[in-house]
């Protein structure tokens, strides 16, 4: 391989990496405490491909009368598999989360009846697809204390915040972008923030208008 060809390959690789910028987002609650499992979505104005795509399938387990994980992040069109590991039945319902729950119609959601697991038998499971962006509130008609969430996004750049309330994207295309935050306890979504992704790490802070609920153990 000639020197010129090697140089050309190196130049192409450099140009590809040069267009990937870092955006760091911090989410805190009304009291200034870090919020885990908030969903952060970045919508760049430039076209690109995320190097960390979301999985098109996710499993949500019902165990000890809880949804595990409590917050599931998927792309629009993803398949959700609900698995009942409890020995009693669950009647799972999904409906719009946030303010959307007050104007939702009968067709704006789904219901799944899952029999309890029998000793020595495989757990019962059912699938459902998520075809609209936004938050979905999960509950159970039989056990009113059960509460979980699904968030479907149409942007490839999306992730949940860590226990420290942070979400760091290292592959955002250079240029302007809009950043949105969704959190399960927030009735109305926070206003989006504009950011310019480039050579310097872009840092944004979002503060909720509520105190995040603690997950029931």
Language-model features, listed with the residues they occupy:
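Bacterial N-terminal signal peptides
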Residues: 6-15
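N-terminal secretory signal peptides that target proteins for export/translocation
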Residues: 1-4
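Extracytoplasmic copper-binding redox domains, predominantly the cupredoxin/blue-copper superfamily
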Residues: 20-217
């Amino acid at each position: 391989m000639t020197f010129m060809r090697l140089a050309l390959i190196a130049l192409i690789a450099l140009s590809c990496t040069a267009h990937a910028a870092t955006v760091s987002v911090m989410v805190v609650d009304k009291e200034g405490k870090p919020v885990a499992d908030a969903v952060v979505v970045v919508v760049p104005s430039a076209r690109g491909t995320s190097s960390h795509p979301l999985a098109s399938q996710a499993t949500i387990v019902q165990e000890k009368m809880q949804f595990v994980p409590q917050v599931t992040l998927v792309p629009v069109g993803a398949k959700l598999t609900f698995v009942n590991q409890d020995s009693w039945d669950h009647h799972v319902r999904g409906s719009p989360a946030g303010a959307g729950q007050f104007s939702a119609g009968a067709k704006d959601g789904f219901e799944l009846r899952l029999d309890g697991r029998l000793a020595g038998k495989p757990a019962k499971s059912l699938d459902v697809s998520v075809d609209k962006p936004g938050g979905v509130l999960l509950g159970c008609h039989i056990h009113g204390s059960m509460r979980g969430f699904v968030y479907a996004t149409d942007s490839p750049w999306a992730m949940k915040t860590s226990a420290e309330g942070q979400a760091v994207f290292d592959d955002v295309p250079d240029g302007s972008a809009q950043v949105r935050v969704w959190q399960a306890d927030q009735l109305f979504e926070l206003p989006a923030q504009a950011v310019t992704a480039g050579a310097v790490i872009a840092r944004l802070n979002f503060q909720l208008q509520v105190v995040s609920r603690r997950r029931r153990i």
